[in-house]
Amino acid sequence: MKILIPTAKEMNTDLPSIEANPLRPESQAVLDALALYSASQLESFYKVSAEKAVEEFQHIQALKRQTAQHYPALNLFDGLMYRHIKRDKLTEAEQVYLENHVFITSALYGVVPALSPMAPHRLDFLMKLKVAGKTLKSHWKTAYDEALKQEEMIFSLLSSEFETVFSKEIREKMVTFKFMEDRGGQLKIHSTISKKARGAFLTALIENQVQTVEEARRLSFAGFNYREDLSQPQELVFVKEV
């Protein structure tokens, strides 16, 4: 069983660095394509300020020169979902579960274990980067499928932009999750609720060593409980009353 989570734009590099792994060929091809952009071109590519574009340019060039600092990916990313994941003071069993089951989907590194070394970078599948004439999704599809072809059970905490990198055959194995708030009988869903809840849900999976859909249904976390009446066999809905 594998649990898939996305990358995040926000990063925290105030961490001890770790040794890098050699880049796989698919990653090197993406890096080579990114490295063709000047800082001013990156400003429009990323739709960021000139200052931010220079920072990203430096990240890319450091990766090219193999001088970039690397950090465990789960600790490097620091978006809302990540800040709600239990990332330290793990028991030995929780650490083993995390290492065996939690994987990050990256547009630069592929599908990798959550504690894999990553360097700071900014890239997702909505960005219009061409790699040898292909979109990022087309470039990664074979490698993404290969990473999961042996899996019978896949828990996806991904947004659709990441899920659609996988073939239909792989997506059909995925169990997805929806997190909603019940405000006086009105069910609400928005990205802030979803991101926080994904992190809290992953924490509950880790703490309870969940291996099956049935075990996931029984979880209660951060005020969320499973709602059978709103769920489908491959989409579990959790609701928090506020």
Regions found by a protein language model. Give the residues of each.
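Active-site helix-to-loop segments that bind/position phosphate- or nucleotide-bearing substrates
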Residues: 2-89
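Internal, well-folded beta-alpha domain core
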Residues: 86-233, 237-242
